[in-house]
Amino acid sequence: FSAIKRTYHYYVHRDKDPFLRMYSCELHYDLDFALMNEAAQYLLQVSDFGAFCKSHTDVKTTLCDVTEAKWVQVSDHAWYFVISANRFLRNMVRAVVGTLIEVGRHRMTLEQFRDVVAGKNRSDAGESMPGHALFLERVEYAPESMQYNINEGL
């Protein structure tokens, strides 16, 4: 638990592609990625992510420090969401992505998105996206936690 930063990517694509279907979520609708990125930037301003925590868990705190949240276009039909934080709640990334997709489909306004986050109620947020498209991309540790002592081992 000595990691100071974790980065996840969640992959989505539009066209049928047998090579992507195991690693990316296929979507059948247009999305407004500019609006989704605007909503994602709001995540950098908040610290309580109770709205995106799996229901009925005994987590001690829903506080997280999100330092990066944005959609990146890979091609004309593929994107990924990148999010970095000091810690994540169970199901948090998939719930964030599902809620951002509601924004991108114009089913939720930016103001409603902010209200969902502020309300800290999981039932107000969007659906959790499937897990097969979520990948842990990077974990960073404090330099002092990685010091090797020859007498103690790692």
Residue ranges and their predicted role:
Residues 1-154:
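Structured-RNA-binding interfaces characteristic of tRNA pseudouridine synthases
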